[in-house]
């Protein structure tokens, strides 16, 4: 049921309905595309497979969501109406059923080609940080580009396991997908060509798909995904690393003027935690870089009194070309509060890469803050974030 909310253009319905497998396009009929949404389902699916060994789930079938939104939320399908239902159909009028693997590929291949002028994935209406919502035209999320790179490698590994353990040699994929997975690697450097490839794919399935499928060797797909992953990681390493004495970190975003958000500015150092988390988790960050990131995070983001690692340093600017978060007072909400979810992912990433002491520090500081009732003022548990005074906020989340 959970993959039934994915559109064939790689975007997804954003609201879960009242029944299993029921989805609603968006809240209040406001079309928004969060560029990170395609990344999370694979994490959950891979976790399930790790826990159960059930690789066969990748071959199970699910429909695709269909509504008026097409071409990744940038146009409307004039040939669609609600009487046609909410499932994608083919040229024969049949509901399209694709494997879970195919759904995941659709999400990741479309994301790979939707890039901005620095060849990172476009931020669109936001990513995990909902408050980065004012850079739709030129914004890019380097942070989640790294996250997708890690996923592409994970998916390649799952495909290899599917071949080795279940002896599956081929998979059937939508014929329309072929130009995306088959593209020559030289195109990866060509921003205009990538954008054109994505646009052609989206237009080929804007109202319906042909219904044709092609069998593809698993090894070919796995090799392509591995190469895509490696290309992204190398690109980020070469273009987004910020040097700072014996420490450093990765730039996480580009704003709506296509400018790098982090680094050394007249107003001070600008650093965000999100880009470091996914660079580490995805293995984009190499071991020595992780050591330098930890030093920088301790120097610029760590505040024990606030509960640990803040989401960002104080930019001393209301950046209306990036998001509403800069309209909040520093230390509140997304503007520099200690966000429990991102801190936990920072710890998770560090543990995954063998930096156990550093990961423990992040988690333990969260625990100490939450357990200190005189300051946190919450019942036992973890709040959404700790504000500038160290108080736990939105505990019910």
Language-model region placement:
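Acidic, mature catalytic/reactive cores of soluble proteins
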Residues: 1-397
